[in-house]
Amino acid sequence: MTVATGDPSDEAAAHPGNPAEYDPDADHECCERVVINISGLRFETQLKTLSQFPDTLLGDPKKRMRYFDPLRNEYFFDRSRTSFDAILYFYQSGGRLRRPANVTLDIFSEEIRFYELGDEAIELFREDEGFVKEEERPLPDNEFQRQVWLLFEYPESSGPARIIAIISVMVILISIVSFCLETLPIFRNDDDEPHSVFDTNTNTTIYFTSTYFTDPFFILETLCIIWFSFEFLVRLFACPSKSGFFGNVMNIIDVVAIIPYFITLATELAEKPEDGQAGQQAMSLAILRVIRLVRVFRIFKLSRHSKGLQILGQTLKASMRELGLLIFFLFIGVILFSSAVYFAEADEPESQFESIPDAFWWAVVSMTTVGYGDMVPTTIGGKIVGSLCAIAGVLTIALPVPVIVSNFNYFYHRETEGEEQAQCLGPVTKEDSNEELKKSRSGSTISKSDYMEIQEGVNNTIEDIPEENLKTQANCTTLANTNYVNITKMLTDV
């Protein structure tokens, strides 16, 4: 038991525990209360609660002093009442921020900016609201490389960058159109395949190939590849990270779009048909056609400049689980109904279903409701199986579609409303604070002249007030607050 000595009215002496460890200032601050008036609704909290976040508007004594009403001995804010419950809970809970259900996102975002809760609180709020955190886009350290990187990677950064993006899109479209037109019969040159002529004078076979390098489509393709290669090499030179550059799917597509040209070029230059090698040349031509087919992937280069294609790619990526389930269900249905229709048509002499693998095509076409009609059941049992197959296909495809559509809507709205949300959650500016201060003043019962006098006195004396006095300003009520009268008198006398 601790025995108190001296004056029994001394609170410090009567405090239980070790008297040397007792801090009366801490106990004094713990008891101080702050009254905050939000558009007529009064809130009361302890000073130490607000002091947990000294960089915010309510936590900084100098910042909140601008809104002090000395006649009412309270802080007045002409702000949203319903939002302040969550703002005050932010201080009481140590940093947890939850938007009330009856407050819209834009209004609550404005309140966060006004009370200057900080970037960390905004990020936590965005995560709680379900916003996907935007990926950081590093820029090169070198100034020249940074300008080049912005020029080729971010079309919205400047006018020249927009022009380069337009040129790139036009070249991609020209390349795709050329790829399609060269297959038309009037443009197709069937002399690409090697042919031979027997020379009776030398008793040898001479192989000929077409003049590939004089083909107008080859010249047009060469011009497109020059631009693609130039663009790729410049972006590779200016990129901030080489490993990150080659890890990007879009850059891999760029490489895939360029490589077939050089493989084709090398094959044409190295091709020298000799006697007995006609079969190898035919095989080489087949491989070459497959390589040329890869050129069609250039169409994906448009996704670099198209938000719609990017949204589609994000939707497919987010819906991989649903797409996998769809393919799995289709696989089960194909096996089940192809087996059923085969045995249902087994006794039919003119049946088109000669085996279960032959019926796979019919099952896929029926379940996807395409119905080419090249394979049809003729027996009653086969028609029943076909009907069940079509119904099962409709149900199987329809089930995961709403989930995929929901993902698409999410990414679409996130992309279209991203800029507006970023503006709502942007940092508060000095002009915004001044405007909010004017609104707060206009809603007070004190006259304009009185406010000007009080504000002038606050501005002239706030820097001279010691920090410990700011902690015990007029609005705070304690068991023994000796600074209350002095500060009130100072503000009202000005």
Curated annotation (Swiss-Prot):
| Alphabetized InterPro entries for the sequence | BTB/POZ_dom, Ion_trans_dom, K_chnl_volt-dep_Kv, K_chnl_volt-dep_Kv1, K_chnl_volt-dep_Kv1.2, SKP1/BTB/POZ_sf, T1-type_BTB, VG_K_chnl
Record flagged with keyword Cell membrane: yes
Q: Which UniProt keywords apply?
A: Cell membrane, Glycoprotein, Ion channel, Ion transport, Lipoprotein, Membrane, Palmitate, Phosphoprotein, Potassium, Potassium channel, Potassium transport, Transmembrane, Transmembrane helix, Transport, Voltage-gated channel
* Positions marked as site (Important for binding with the scorpion mesomartoxin): V376
PDZ-binding (motif): residue ranges? 492-494
User: Record's Gene3D superfamilies?
Assistant: 1.10.287.70, Potassium Channel Kv1.1, Chain A, Voltage-gated potassium channels. Chain C
Tissue expression notes: Expressed in oligodendrocytes.
**GO molecular function ontology, one term from the record:** delayed rectifier potassium channel activity
Gene Ontology terms: cellular component: axon terminus; dendrite; juxtaparanode region of axon; plasma membrane; voltage-gated potassium channel complex
Q: Which residues lie within the membrane without crossing it?
A: 357-368, 369-376
TM spans, by residue?
A: 160-181, 217-238, 250-270, 285-305, 321-342, 384-412
Kindly list the places in or outside the cell where this protein is found, as annotated in its UniProt entry. Answer: Cell membrane
Q: Which residues lie on this side of the membrane: Cytoplasmic?
A: 1-159, 239-249, 306-320, 413-494
- Cell membrane in keyword set: yes
Q: What does this protein do?
A: Voltage-gated potassium channel that mediates transmembrane potassium transport in excitable membranes, primarily in the brain and central nervous system. Prevents aberrant action potential firing and regulates neuronal output. Forms tetrameric potassium-selective channels through which potassium ions pass in accordance with their electrochemical gradient. The channel alternates between opened and closed conformations in response to the voltage difference across the membrane.
UniProt free text on domains? The cytoplasmic N-terminus is important for tetramerization. Interactions between the different subunits modulate the gating characteristics. The transmembrane segment S4 functions as a voltage-sensor and is characterized by a series of positively charged amino acids at every third position. Channel opening and closing is effected by a conformation change that affects the position and orientation of the voltage-sensor paddle formed by S3 and S4 within the membrane. A transmembrane electric field that is positive inside would push the positively charged S4 segment outwards, thereby opening the pore, while a field that is negative inside would pull the S4 segment inwards and close the pore.
Q: Which family does it belong to?
A: Belongs to the potassium channel family. A (Shaker) (TC 1.A.1.2) subfamily. Kv1.2/KCNA2 sub-subfamily.
Question: Quaternary form?
Answer: Homotetramer and heterotetramer with other family members.
Name it. Potassium voltage-gated channel subfamily A member 2
Q: Which organism is it from?
A: Oncorhynchus mykiss
Its gene is: kcna2
